[in-house]
Amino acid sequence: MKKDILTRVMSKSPEIYFNKDNKIAFISDCHRGDGTYKDDLMPNANIYMTALNYYYRNNFTYIEIGDGDELWKVKNIEDIYNTYPDIFKLLLKFKYDNRLYMLYGNHDEIKATKKFKHMIDRIDRNEEENDVYNLFHDLPIYEGLVLNYEDLKRLFVIHGHQVDKINYNLEPFASFIVRYVWSFLEGHLGFKNGTSPARSNTKRKKVDKKLQQWVKLNNQPIVAGHTHRSRLPQPDEIPYFNDGCCIHPYSVSSIEIEKGKISLIKWSIKSLENGVLTVRREIIGGPELLVNYKII
């Protein structure tokens, strides 16, 4: 019998064991760009960098669940590095500490290809872009991960575009349209890309529903991204978690696991009474014990 796409991906995904002493942060859909009108992260870059620094300083393992880099609209990863060198340097520190796992989504699926490897191998290692080479040249880029919590609960981590037909089965066509059509229409004429779940509430709900159905059918919790809609269910609800994105107006969302508990986090800019702007970390969901989640 032919396996469904999520079951197939899960069956070949590496399994990582962790316990209540481990701390994990999930972030997806950063869409790091080239600093032009095509760069969706730019307005929230300082918020994202603050979150990333927090996770590094506090010994979290950082799992990026796809669409970290906007490689549909931007052809060359070096152009993204030149816009965000400090972010890449911090990701490299996570890697050197063995605290970095990177998955690909539809917008950076090229990272899992030989074409991307050749792009990295061609980087002049005498230049500053050496950080890009050091980050990517031997970094596994996964389609999925399985996190095993003390043999009590397994979490399947995946971007989520696999259940979104136009962004998975028709990825070359979708990436062409986004790079050469929608990026122009959005940047110059203000049109909204209706093919993306991130921009279409109808498509977002369809993707959420498909992922929830798979979770229930397979008795397997999922942590995903893709839809840009964060969610942390109650323990008596279907355990489909979504870390949201980094490109909502003035905010970034993430999911944290600490001391065996899972939480949904919002990072946003707040103004203090003295007029100083600061980035605030706010728990907006949970914390809930992982072991309390049941399939209904």
Predicted regions and their residues:
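Active-site-proximal beta-strand elements of phosphoester/diester hydrolases
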Residues: 23-31, 154-161, 240-244
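Structural motif
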Residues: 23-24, 60-62, 153-155, 221, ...
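Binuclear metal-dependent phosphoesterase catalytic core
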Residues: 148, 238-296
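Active-site-proximal loop/helix segment associated with metal-binding centers of metalloenzymes
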Residues: 155-209
